[in-house]
């Protein structure tokens, strides 16, 4: 998906439409983020959780999302960067990313988003601690943490945890 998005940017396509989940959307964002020309991005939800499309209030029905695609009505969204990877919703440190990455396709198909919750709960039980340094405009933190979540929204999963967050800043948990 990243290479396709890079090519679309290089060839100056008007738009890129991605069908997939949050991981696929992040791959496309990584492919167009720092380009001289950035095509418009349309997203058709095709993953398990589809949190990015839910946060953007995109119709969760595939046919409905396709019918509602309108590249004359666009919004800018915040994106984040960690090392060389971009993200459109969340970046995390700790056992959470591995737990999410290691969910088996069969489990996602059978249990849906619950498969992520089960793996996440298993991972939280490990007491692995990381030395971290977080620098913000409001102060710095140097110390240990088992998990760090950087959110570009006011939601975590489907739970609202902050007031509106369209300010260009990330929330750190």
Which stretches of residues belong to each language-model region?
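Catalytic core of DAGKc-family lipid kinases
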Residues: 34-150
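Polar, low-complexity loop segments and adjacent catalytic/binding residues used for recognizing
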Residues: 22
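Internal anion-binding site segments
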Residues: 137, 144-173
């Amino acid at each position: 998906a990243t290479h396709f998005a890079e090519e679309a940017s290089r060839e100056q396509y008007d738009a890129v439409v991605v069908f997939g989940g949050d991981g696929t959307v992040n791959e496309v964002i990584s492919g167009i983020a720092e380009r001289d020309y950035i095509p418009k991005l349309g997203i058709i939800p095709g993953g398990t959780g589809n949190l990015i499309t839910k946060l953007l209030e995109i119709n969760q029905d595939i046919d409905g999302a396709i019918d509602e695609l309108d590249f004359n009505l666009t919004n800018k969204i915040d994106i984040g960067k960690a090392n060389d990877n971009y993200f459109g919703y969340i970046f995390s440190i700790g056992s959470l990313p591995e737990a999410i990455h290691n969910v088996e396709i069969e489990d996602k198909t059978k249990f849906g988003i619950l498969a992520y919750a089960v793996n996440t709960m298993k991972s939280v039980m490990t007491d692995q601690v990381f030395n971290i340094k977080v620098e913000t405009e409001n102060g710095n933190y140097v110390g240990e943490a088992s998990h760090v979540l950087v959110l570009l929204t006011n939601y975590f999963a489907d739970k609202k945890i902050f007031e509106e967050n369209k300010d260009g800043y990330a929330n750190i948990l």
